[in-house]
Amino acid sequence: MTAQIIDGKAIAQSIRTQLREQVTARKEAGQRVPGLAVILVGADPASQVYVGSKRKACEEVGFISRSYDLDTSCSEAELLALIDQLNDDPSIDGILVQLPLPAHIEDSKVIERIRPDKDVDGFHPYNVGRLAQRIPVLRSCTPMGIMTLIKSTGVDTYGLDAVVVGASNIVGRPMTLELLLAGCTTTTCHRFTKNLEQKIRQADLVVVAVGKPGFIPGEWIKPGAIVIDVGINRLENGTLVGDVQYETAAQNASFITPVPGGVGPMTIASLLENTLYAAEQYHD
């Protein structure tokens, strides 16, 4: 068996095309164009690349894109004051603060300062809580994008045994909640997990987000399983690889996401979907 590739790049492009059409329809109906504010603190090269991609995608679909590049020395109070200003700005539907933040700024304080109806990253405790209660509104972007990828396979998720490797607030934990909502029997694995191999060998669906190149051997993948690889790791030779040993895994899986071109583009597509959702549900 050779796995079918889940083409995140193509699916994300399709979403952006649909969003562009919806924005055009809003303008023609005399409605406001959605607005997204993106805040970057410091000059971390990876963060600069991510932020640049988000701004470009915004412009592609016709959103208003506002950029705020703050110096690393920016105080927590200054950042919170900017968020307050954007919370009160009626032209802004979504506020995104690129993580990680410098050590002197507390992530949780910043996340909680963003109004829940403008939290298009889906990180605010209110929005995470809504997902936990099975009534999601603004959902965490990477897990939301992964659910779109899984849906594209046509596989019925109800009753599947799913394993999530990694328990971060950004991916692993909300991913577990998304899979529970989709009817999976879900196991979340982390650094204290015993018998990881055994758990993965039994899984119909595996989502891996640990940030370690080739962490999961491909031979562990159950024949016919769906493999979602969230990792994006740059090797010394410049090659980008995922957290799963791709070539071997692709021989066992029924569907697999490539790295790059799998999950990454979907995170940004989901961010754009959330921004339009916020405009329509909360701010129109």
From Swiss-Prot:
GO terms for biological process: L-histidine biosynthetic process; methionine biosynthetic process; purine nucleotide biosynthetic process; tetrahydrofolate interconversion. The keyword Calcium does not apply. Pathway: One-carbon metabolism; tetrahydrofolate interconversion. Catalyzes the oxidation of 5,10-methylenetetrahydrofolate to 5,10-methenyltetrahydrofolate and then the hydrolysis of 5,10-methenyltetrahydrofolate to 10-formyltetrahydrofolate. NADP(+) binds at G166, A167, S168, I232. One of its GO terms (molecular function) is methylenetetrahydrofolate dehydrogenase (NADP+) activity. CDD domains: NAD_bind_m-THF_DH_Cyclohyd. Pfam families: THF_DHG_CYH, THF_DHG_CYH_C. PANTHER family: C-1-TETRAHYDROFOLATE SYNTHASE, CYTOPLASMIC, C-1-TETRAHYDROFOLATE SYNTHASE, CYTOPLASMIC-RELATED. SUPFAM superfamilies: Aminoacid dehydrogenase-like, N-terminal domain, NAD(P)-binding Rossmann-fold domains. One of its GO terms (cellular component) is cytosol. It catalyses: (6R)-5,10-methylene-5,6,7,8-tetrahydrofolate + NADP(+) = (6R)-5,10-methenyltetrahydrofolate + NADPH; (6R)-5,10-methenyltetrahydrofolate + H2O = (6R)-10-formyltetrahydrofolate + H(+). This is Bifunctional protein FolD. Belongs to the tetrahydrofolate dehydrogenase/cyclohydrolase family. Keywords: Amino-acid biosynthesis, Histidine biosynthesis, Hydrolase, Methionine biosynthesis, Multifunctional enzyme, NADP, One-carbon metabolism, Oxidoreductase, Purine biosynthesis. It comes from the Bacteria. Homodimer. Its EC number is 1.5.1.5, 3.5.4.9. The keyword Cell cycle does not apply. It comes from Shewanella oneidensis (strain ATCC 700550 / JCM 31522 / CIP 106686 / LMG 19005 / NCIMB 14063 / MR-1).
